[in-house]
Structure formats: structure tokens, C-alpha cells
Regions:
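Hydrophobic/aromatic-rich alpha-helical bundle segments in the mid-to-C-terminal region
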Residues: 114-119, 129, 151-197
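Short amphipathic alpha-helical elements of helix-turn-helix/winged-helix folds
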Residues: 27-31, 106, 171
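Amphipathic alpha-helical packing segments from all-alpha helical-bundle domains
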Residues: 76-79, 83-84, 127-153, 162-166, ...
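N-terminal intrinsically disordered/low-complexity leader segments
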Residues: 1-19
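Short coil/turn segments at alpha/beta junctions that flank glycine-rich nucleotide-binding fingerprints
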Residues: 34-38, 89, 110, 153
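Helix-turn-helix
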Residues: 19, 23, 27, 31-65, ...
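Hydrophobic alpha-helical connector segments
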Residues: 69, 83-112, 164-168
Length: 205
């Protein structure tokens, strides 16, 4: 009887994939900040998340995979919201402004995780590093696509598209990394407005 109950609980947890995945990510992020990447075990992550160990191992075979999950979570949050926000928007300039503001907000909301990625990326194994890099390229391609669209439409200058896309990514990360400096004189909204102005001034004919 007890065994059947436990098996059902594990299956139920696995079926509730998004919710469980987020619990694991949040627990891992908190523990990595508190204890460090090396000192944190998967067992501790499982306990902190309130998820059974078999279910945790269903999602994560090794700790480095959680870093990949953190990056995926940020990317999917950005992609999902962007699709909704730019639906019906044809103007590349407006589309880019929406994408920039949204990405900055996603990065700010996941600031602790962004810091972890910068601090602990050297701890990742080769496969996880490669996956994280691929995910970053996917983000840059979203911006590249919109910028390219603006160039083709004659709205934007013929800039180095890849370089501009990565400039945008790093501007968003800079708020997280250097917030201690900027927050003394800029609100987050001011920071976004000024960076967006820099981006559009560089792009517009």
C-alpha cells in the first residue's frame, strides 16, 4: 500500500513537469548562493525543493545540468512573453523596443541566476557549457532577426547585426552585474530608457 502511494506520488510529480522543474531551479539557485556550487549536493537540492530524490534525478543527473536549466528557464520566459507582446506588431523599431524592454526585465527578475551563470560557468562540464552557449546564441538570434528586418526595411543602418545583438544582451546583464553602481543614480526604468535610446540611436538612419 505504502509503496503504491509513493510510486503514484513520484509519477504525479513527474507529470507536473513545469512546476517541479521550477522548484528544482529555485532551490538550486538559493543553495548555490548560500553554500556554493561545489558544496551543494543533489540530495540537498531535492530536500530544499520539496521534491522526492527519484523525481529530482529524473530531471537532473548531475549538478551542472541545473545551470543549463537555469539558462533555459530565462530563455523560455523571454521567448514566451515576446511572442505575445509582438503579436500584430509590424514595425521593426517598435518590435525591437518591446524585445529589449522585455529582455531587460526578464534578466532583472532572474538577477540572482544571471550572477550564478557568470560566477559558476567555469564549473560546468563541456556538454553543459556547450548547451548554455547555444541558448545564449538563440537569444542573440531573436535580436538579430528583428535588427535584420529593420535593415531590410530601410529603417535601420547596415550595422554588424551579431555584434549589436550581443551588445543588447550585455546591456541587460550589466544591470545585474553592476546594479550596485547604477542604482545610486538611476532607477531600473531610467536605465532601460537610456540604454534603449543608445541602441536606437546607433541603428536608426
Amino acid at each position: 500500500m505504502t509503496r503504491s502511494k509513493k510510486t503514484l506520488t513520484v509519477i504525479d510529480q513527474i507529470n507536473a513537469s513545469d512546476k517541479v522543474r521550477k522548484k528544482i531551479i529555485e532551490a538550486a539557485s538559493t543553495l548555490y548562493v548560500q553554500k556554493g556550487f561545489t558544496a551543494t549536493s543533489i540530495e540537498e537540492i531535492s530536500e530544499k525543493a520539496g521534491v522526492s530524490l527519484p523525481v529530482t534525478y529524473h530531471y537532473v543527473k548531475k549538478k551542472s545540468e541545473i545551470m543549463k536549466m537555469i539558462m533555459e528557464d530565462a530563455l523560455y520566459a523571454f521567448q514566451e512573453n515576446l511572442i505575445k507582446e509582438i503579436k500584430g506588431v509590424d514595425d521593426p523599431e517598435e518590435k525591437l523596443a518591446i524585445a529589449v524592454v522585455l529582455y531587460f526585465k526578464v534578466m532583472d527578475g532572474q538577477g540572482e541566476k544571471v550572477l550564478l551563470m557568470y560566477q559558476k560557468s567555469s564549473s560546468l562540464d563541456k556538454a553543459s557549457k556547450s548547451k548554455v552557449m547555444q541558448l545564449e546564441v538563440q537569444v542573440s538570434q531573436i535580436f538579430s532577426g528583428i535588427i535584420e528586418e529593420g535593415i531590410q526595411s530601410g529603417i535601420f543602418n547596415a550595422v554588424d547585426v551579431d555584434l549589436m545583438a550581443y551588445n543588447i544582451i550585455l546591456m541587460a546583464h550589466m544591470w545585474v552585474l553592476k546594479r550596485w553602481h547604477f542604482k545610486k543614480r538611476l532607477s531600473f526604468d531610467n536605465y532601460i530608457d537610456q540604454q534603449l535610446a543608445i541602441i536606437l540611436n546607433a541603428l536608426k538612419l
